[in-house]
């Protein structure tokens, strides 16, 4: 599958820009008000007690700011942050090397923490609970375990699949926070802030047009901003207005709901070829020439979240919103009864 402009996971060229756009403090962070309020209390309490912050788990869809919040936590506490990810830590020794190099109060950020293998995960248990590292010396009957003290630290984990975390690991996080999709007005503020940092000229209506099509996700908003900037510099006077943003996003095949061509193809296939559904996932996969896992993990979540697709035991159903968005009338009483 080629990279989509509205893909919430990072593209390779996103990362350098994202690092420059990340907020450094809580008061710079836009959106996630409940999460921010909770963190402000927990961070201040940790400061007053001169203790490390309890271990924190962030979960939610990709691109909502989990890494940015980990950065904010380390900056607010005035400590260093060490970043890694679940798939990178292949052996227990890899994790042991990271843990033994931490300093008092440091933040260890593990992205995609649900992808840690079980052997590595078990090393984390005593490290999180007792700030100790169990090291096995020798093999066979002569093997023995020694305990190595670690400096107190804060583990910040991030996951898009909280249900895949084992209960023992999940229970060791003192703070668990879910990140929600952003509102349009919050995304407008993010677009405006990013434009200022990147030196992009955008007016209020132009920022709003980009925000509307960003699928509730800051990462997508920032990516669309950069692509619209390209269009504005080549086809306009370099300033992003509502009209320029609309023309650029149409050229990129991103409609007013933030759907791309494949999103619309999935909905139109269900409606036009299968009378609105229900249609099985394997049949739909063959009809749109896309792998089942890709449909379930990449395309369906947002369509379901926005109410354009229903997932039932009998298959997928297009909702009335899907008909209206595509400009297709509901063509039978059977379809009307579904909703």
Swiss-Prot record:
<feature type="region of interest" description="Small ATPAse domain (RuvB-S)">
    <location>
        <begin position="183"/>
        <end position="253"/>
    </location>
</feature>
<dbReference type="InterPro" id="IPR036388">
    <property type="entry name" value="WH-like_DNA-bd_sf"/>
</dbReference>
<keyword id="KW-0067">ATP-binding</keyword>
<keyword id="KW-0233">DNA recombination</keyword>
<feature type="binding site">
    <location>
        <position position="182"/>
    </location>
    <ligand>
        <name>ATP</name>
    </ligand>
</feature>
<dbReference type="InterPro" id="IPR003593">
    <property type="entry name" value="AAA+_ATPase"/>
</dbReference>
<dbReference type="GO" id="GO:0005524">
    <property type="term" value="F:ATP binding"/>
</dbReference>
<dbReference type="InterPro" id="IPR008824">
    <property type="entry name" value="RuvB-like_N"/>
</dbReference>
<feature type="binding site">
    <location>
        <position position="63"/>
    </location>
    <ligand>
        <name>ATP</name>
    </ligand>
</feature>
<dbReference type="GO" id="GO:0006310">
    <property type="term" value="P:DNA recombination"/>
</dbReference>
<feature type="binding site">
    <location>
        <position position="316"/>
    </location>
    <ligand>
        <name>DNA</name>
    </ligand>
</feature>
<feature type="region of interest" description="Head domain (RuvB-H)">
    <location>
        <begin position="256"/>
        <end position="339"/>
    </location>
</feature>
<dbReference type="GO" id="GO:0048476">
    <property type="term" value="C:Holliday junction resolvase complex"/>
</dbReference>
<protein>
    <recommendedName>
        <fullName>Holliday junction branch migration complex subunit RuvB</fullName>
        <ecNumber>3.6.4.-</ecNumber>
    </recommendedName>
</protein>
<feature type="binding site">
    <location>
        <position position="292"/>
    </location>
    <ligand>
        <name>DNA</name>
    </ligand>
</feature>
<keyword id="KW-0238">DNA-binding</keyword>
<dbReference type="GO" id="GO:0016887">
    <property type="term" value="F:ATP hydrolysis activity"/>
</dbReference>
<comment type="function">
    <text>The RuvA-RuvB-RuvC complex processes Holliday junction (HJ) DNA during genetic recombination and DNA repair, while the RuvA-RuvB complex plays an important role in the rescue of blocked DNA replication forks via replication fork reversal (RFR). RuvA specifically binds to HJ cruciform DNA, conferring on it an open structure. The RuvB hexamer acts as an ATP-dependent pump, pulling dsDNA into and through the RuvAB complex. RuvB forms 2 homohexamers on either side of HJ DNA bound by 1 or 2 RuvA tetramers; 4 subunits per hexamer contact DNA at a time.</text>
</comment>
<feature type="binding site">
    <location>
        <begin position="129"/>
        <end position="131"/>
    </location>
    <ligand>
        <name>ATP</name>
    </ligand>
</feature>
<feature type="binding site">
    <location>
        <position position="22"/>
    </location>
    <ligand>
        <name>ATP</name>
    </ligand>
</feature>
<feature type="binding site">
    <location>
        <position position="172"/>
    </location>
    <ligand>
        <name>ATP</name>
    </ligand>
</feature>
<dbReference type="InterPro" id="IPR027417">
    <property type="entry name" value="P-loop_NTPase"/>
</dbReference>
<dbReference type="Pfam" id="PF05496">
    <property type="entry name" value="RuvB_N"/>
</dbReference>
<dbReference type="InterPro" id="IPR004605">
    <property type="entry name" value="DNA_helicase_Holl-junc_RuvB"/>
</dbReference>
<feature type="binding site">
    <location>
        <position position="311"/>
    </location>
    <ligand>
        <name>DNA</name>
    </ligand>
</feature>
<keyword id="KW-0963">Cytoplasm</keyword>
<keyword id="KW-0234">DNA repair</keyword>
<feature type="binding site">
    <location>
        <position position="66"/>
    </location>
    <ligand>
        <name>ATP</name>
    </ligand>
</feature>
<dbReference type="InterPro" id="IPR036390">
    <property type="entry name" value="WH_DNA-bd_sf"/>
</dbReference>
<keyword id="KW-0378">Hydrolase</keyword>
<dbReference type="Pfam" id="PF05491">
    <property type="entry name" value="RuvB_C"/>
</dbReference>
<feature type="region of interest" description="Disordered">
    <location>
        <begin position="1"/>
        <end position="20"/>
    </location>
</feature>
<feature type="compositionally biased region" description="Basic and acidic residues">
    <location>
        <begin position="1"/>
        <end position="14"/>
    </location>
</feature>
<dbReference type="InterPro" id="IPR008823">
    <property type="entry name" value="RuvB_C"/>
</dbReference>
<feature type="binding site">
    <location>
        <position position="67"/>
    </location>
    <ligand>
        <name>Mg(2+)</name>
    </ligand>
</feature>
<dbReference type="Pfam" id="PF17864">
    <property type="entry name" value="AAA_lid_4"/>
</dbReference>
<dbReference type="GO" id="GO:0000400">
    <property type="term" value="F:four-way junction DNA binding"/>
</dbReference>
<dbReference type="GO" id="GO:0006281">
    <property type="term" value="P:DNA repair"/>
</dbReference>
<dbReference type="InterPro" id="IPR041445">
    <property type="entry name" value="AAA_lid_4"/>
</dbReference>
<feature type="binding site">
    <location>
        <position position="219"/>
    </location>
    <ligand>
        <name>ATP</name>
    </ligand>
</feature>
<keyword id="KW-0547">Nucleotide-binding</keyword>
<feature type="binding site">
    <location>
        <position position="67"/>
    </location>
    <ligand>
        <name>ATP</name>
    </ligand>
</feature>
């Amino acid at each position: 599958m080629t990279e989509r402009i509205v893909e919430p996971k990072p593209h390779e060229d996103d990362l350098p820009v994202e690092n420059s756009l990340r907020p450094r403090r809580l008061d710079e962070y836009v959106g996630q008000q409940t999460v921010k309020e909770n963190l402000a209390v927990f961070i201040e309490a940790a400061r007053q007690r001169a203790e490390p912050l309890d271990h924190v788990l962030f979960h939610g869809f990709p691109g909502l700011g989990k890494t940015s919040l980990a950065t904010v936590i380390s900056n607010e506490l005035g400590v260093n942050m060490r970043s890694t990810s679940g798939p990178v830590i292949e052996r227990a020794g890899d994790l042991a090397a990271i843990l033994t190099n931490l300093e008092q109060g440091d933040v260890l950020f593990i992205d995609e923490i649900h992808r840690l293998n079980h052997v590595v995960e078990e090393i984390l248990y005593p490290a999180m609970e007792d700030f100790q590292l169990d090291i096995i010396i020798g093999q066979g009957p002569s093997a023995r375990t020694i305990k190595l003290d670690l400096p107190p630290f804060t583990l910040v984990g991030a996951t898009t699949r909280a249900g895949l975390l084992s209960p023992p690991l999940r229970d060791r996080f003192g703070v668990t926070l879910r990140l929600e999709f952003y509102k349009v007005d919050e995304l407008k503020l993010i677009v405006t802030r990013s434009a200022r940092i990147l030196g992009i000229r955008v007016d209020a209506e132009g920022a709003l047009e980009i925000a509307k099509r960003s699928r509730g996700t800051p990462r997508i908003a920032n990516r669309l901003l950069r692509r619209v900037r390209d269009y504005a510099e080549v086809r306009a006077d370099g300033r992003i207005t509502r009209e320029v943003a609309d023309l650029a996003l149409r050229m990129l095949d991103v409609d007013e709901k933030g759907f791309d061509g494949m999103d619309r193809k999935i909905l139109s296939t269900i409606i036009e070829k299968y009378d609105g559904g229900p249609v099985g996932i394997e049949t739909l996969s063959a009809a749109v020439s896309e792998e089942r896992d890709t449909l379930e993990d990449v395309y369906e979540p947002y369509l379901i979240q926005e109410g354009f697709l229903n997932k039932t035991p009998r298959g997928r159903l297009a909702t009335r919103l899907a008909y209206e968005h595509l400009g297709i009338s509901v063509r039978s009483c059977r379809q009307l009864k579904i909703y």
